[in-house]
Amino acid sequence: GVPCRCDSDGPSVHGNTLSGTIWVGSCETGWHKCNTEHNLFHECCKQ
């Protein structure tokens, strides 16, 4: 999947590890949304 930034990754500066994965729609079962950003068509999710 496409990596995305979770709140726990810290501020989005170059070089940070992106620990989330973008899911279209909402997060897969067993995953949870890991940031506070509001996106219309996808969520940044983490297992």
Swiss-Prot record:
Q: What broad class describes the main subcellular location of this protein?
A: secreted
Which cysteines are cross-linked by disulfides?
4-44, 6-34, 27-45
InterPro entries referenced in this protein's UniProt entry, alphabetically: Myo_ane_neurotoxin_sf
Which keywords has UniProt assigned to this entry?
Disulfide bond, Hydroxylation, Ion channel impairing toxin, Nematocyst, Neurotoxin, Secreted, Toxin, Voltage-gated sodium channel impairing toxin
Q: Where in the cell is it found?
A: Secreted; Nematocyst
Coiled coil spans: none
Record's Pfam families?
Toxin_4
Hydroxyproline is carried by which residues? Answer: 3
Gene Ontology molecular function terms on file? sodium channel regulator activity; toxin activity
| GO CC list | extracellular region; nematocyst
Instruction: Please tell me what else the database record remarks about this protein.
Output: A synonymy between H.magnifica and R.crispa is controversial.
**Protein family:** Belongs to the sea anemone sodium channel inhibitory toxin family. Type I subfamily.
Q: What does this protein do?
A: Inhibits voltage-gated sodium channels (Nav).
The protein, known as: Delta-stichotoxin-Hcr3a
> Native species of this protein?
Radianthus crispa (Leathery sea anemone)
